[in-house]
Amino acid sequence: MNLIKHAAFAASFQGETDCTSHASARKFSTSGSSPLLDSTEGNGFKGHSMLAPFTAGWHSTDLEPLIIERSEGSYVYDSKGNKYLDTLAGLWCTALGGSEPRLVKAATDQLNKLPFYHSFWNSTAKPPLDLAEELISMFTAKEMGKVFFTNSGSEANDSQVKLVWYYNNALGRPNKKKIIAQSQAYHGSTLISASLSGLPAMHLKFDLPAPFVLHTDCPHYWRFGLPGEAEEEFATRLADNLENLILKEGPETVAAFIAEPVIGAGGVIPPPKTYFEKIQAVLQKYDVLFIADEVITGFGRLGTMFGSDLYNIKPDLVSLAKALSSAYVPIGATLVSPEISDVVHSQSNKIGFFAHGFTYSGHPVSCAVALEALKIYRERNIPAHVKQISPRFQEGIKAFAGSSIIGETRGVGLLLATEFANNKSPNDPFPVEWGVAQIFGAECKKRGMLVKVVGDEIAMSPPLIMSQREVDGLVSIYGEALKATEERVAELRSKKK
């Protein structure tokens, strides 16, 4: 019964957008546990009272949740004493692994000194001031002028839209308000950031997306490249489509374009060659701002301090979160270029104040932990470590790409996804009820490794502190789980015949 329910849950995330096919729209199933392993029917589980994010209702009544009690380095330990290699670093975020003593000390010291003070009305604490300076110094792809603090990446992206609107209103352009995002990208789950997310499941039954949000092509060459179309030609076509969309809507109405350097939660999709070069040319032509969502790619994930460094992105605004504090405490940030921050400054003087903020904006404990995290990234040269170790990770996993059940393995740095496909074709998915990725995830879990299952894919984004030995162990478990999954798929194929 649970397997049927789980298939229905995965299927509920299917849907179509302008750029998604029947197969690609299957991606955003967010259940990471397998009913084959976690079913608690008949064992006395009474359910729980938490309305859990991205979780089907029946999970809270039929499935005992995986309860993680502690972490150490790249590993987490559940309530039953099982040890797992956490290949998603929580939710793409515990970059420095579990229980880093320097971060714990930074939090404790700040809690003892000043557990909270706000940043309203020209009052603040020292940690947010210091952190803002550090972030402006650290982000070098383009000069930034100011930093606004939030509590999450969702809030950061939400705030970006408000800043863009405020900016255009100040310049006397009240109609320049539309935001263009990519189909299949994920930007958060607030009202605005969920609208920006190009995933049907984020919109279904929520009356989203908001009418001011438009979506353009997903830059996934393997899935959407035309027969005989080179990667650079694919990028040109997508840039042309973006330009046509801007012209159709009217450049005077389009305010900004938002993109991750590498699409993360929407499927781990690195951009095709020349993509951002061509996209930025279009944006500059029509005076459209570029918001770089670096929530996942920031602080070394791709082997550079920021994804913008790797892909030569020159954004006007930047969103940060997750690894900003290695997820030890909630914090996000928006970086704003001087061209925009100067206008915001001037407009706020005319109005009387900048009327946007949160109680916890620049929380001193969060900022103190983030400051220590930034010190560690620099002192240990985490981007260089990722650059050194990521070939072992990428090549180790991609060595299995010839498997008959793998359609594509893609990634960069310590960010990777494997997409399962029948006959290795992007247009020939496995039947939903087979739950191929779920089977793989369950086999990994049996062997002491957690991966994220996303529809027909599994995703990995391990802690940036992983050792070569841990990478080798990850690759070994991946291979064993793949072999077991191939055997199960062979059984399912034979039954289907």
Swiss-Prot record:
GO biological process, one term: gamma-aminobutyric acid metabolic process
Subcellular location, record wording: Mitochondrion
EC number: 2.6.1.96
Keyword Mitochondrion included in the entry's annotation: yes
UniProt-annotated binding residues for pyridoxal 5'-phosphate: 153-154, 293
Broad EC category: transferase
Residue numbers carrying N6-(pyridoxal phosphate)lysine: 322
Alphabetized UniProt keyword annotations: Aminotransferase, Mitochondrion, Pyridoxal phosphate, Transferase, Transit peptide
Residue numbers binding substrate: 186, 322
CDD domains: OAT_like
Keyword Nucleotidyltransferase attributed: no
InterPro entries listed in its UniProt record: Aminotrans_3 (IPR005814), Aminotrans_3_PPA_site (IPR049704), PyrdxlP-dep_Trfase (IPR015424), PyrdxlP-dep_Trfase_major (IPR015421), PyrdxlP-dep_Trfase_small (IPR015422)
Molecular function via GO: 4-aminobutyrate:pyruvate transaminase activity; adenosylmethionine-8-amino-7-oxononanoate transaminase activity; pyridoxal phosphate binding
Range of the transit peptide: 1-37
GO cellular component, one term: mitochondrion
NCBIfam families, per database record: PRK06105.1 (NF004767)
Family per record: Belongs to the class-III pyridoxal-phosphate-dependent aminotransferase family.
The protein's role, per its UniProt record: Transaminase that degrades gamma-amino butyric acid (GABA).
Protein name, UniProt field: Probable gamma-aminobutyrate transaminase 2, mitochondrial
Organism: Oryza sativa subsp. indica
